[in-house]
Amino acid sequence: MIKKFDFLIIGGGVAGMSYALKVSQSGKGKVALVCKTSFEESNTSKAQGGIASVTNLIVDNFDKHIQDTMIAGDYISDPVAVEQVVKGGPAGINDLVKWGVNFDKKENGEFDLHREGGHSEFRILHHADDTGFEIQRGLIEA
């Protein structure tokens, strides 16, 4: 049996799955998502750290995050790419939350942000010590 799709996405980690969800939800066509093992076995699911994103504009901003990233990259990172990724971070976090990913929160409902190496502010979103597993779980269920 021949199956026809408008989009073929190869890779079942956060990049492939999030793109598949966006395309599918846009209604622009049928999506096929393939991976070499199972969706639960992606590299994303093994990531333990967190995701850096500006979420609290009272104490943090894009310029600080860009500067931290350029310093951590010994100023050889492409500044245009760094700016694009940093400024796109909040929208990416919003998408993950919309798709059901649960990041740790404080009692007041705000994200429980951490500060890790290379960051001058608390901007690391996480889920216990298995952030990647939680992201993958949320994407699979979405």
What are these regions (language model features)?
Residues K30, C35-A142:
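Conserved N-terminal/central alpha/beta ligand/cofactor-binding core
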